[in-house]
Amino acid sequence: KKIEMDVLRNGEVIGYSNYFFESAENKMTVKNYTKFKVKLLGVTVFSVLSESIEKYENDKLFFFQSNTFQNDKEKFVNLKYNESSKKFIINGSSYKGEASLDCIIGNWWNHKIFKASKQISPLSGSIKEQVVIFLGKEKININNKEYLTEHYKLKSKDESLPDDKKLNFDIWFNPENNLIIKVSYSKMGN
């Protein structure tokens, strides 16, 4: 199974974020490949090239690893579940330490992100407290298909964070198939 997401800027496809799922008995592996570039006047002003792998057993995360180049700067996350402490151990480019099990990897395939109070950055390992607000039901059209969705706003709990560190996303979720079908945020366009 797979989820293929186009990354758009001002309505134009600039890249992708694709998720591939493998399941066997009580285990699941999710691989993600993301690549996009934002260009202004022909010059690349923002870029992401990333690969990650998540592993779950009995629907519980026990391993996550990512390698990312964001604007040619290398970022990474190595996360493992520690059985004795019952915590995640994170070695990331922005955070090294423990995280509680109520944290979720901030990836767009997982609708459980709406229930979490904290997310772990899939690029750097930093932990961000979040607030999720249900805005209402909304019909949206994607690729000439209409969906009845639930529209959410996901924001950083800490309003004092610098803008480039804040979470600020609009998310449209299709409860019929438990899929996030659209994510929007403003950074150098929509």
Set out the residue ranges of the language-model regions.
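Acidic, serine/threonine-rich low-complexity disordered tracts
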Residues: 1-83, 109-190
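Hydrophobic transmembrane alpha-helices
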Residues: 104-108
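Acidic/charged, solvent-exposed loop-and-adjacent secondary-structure segments enriched in E/D, K/R, S/T
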Residues: 84-103
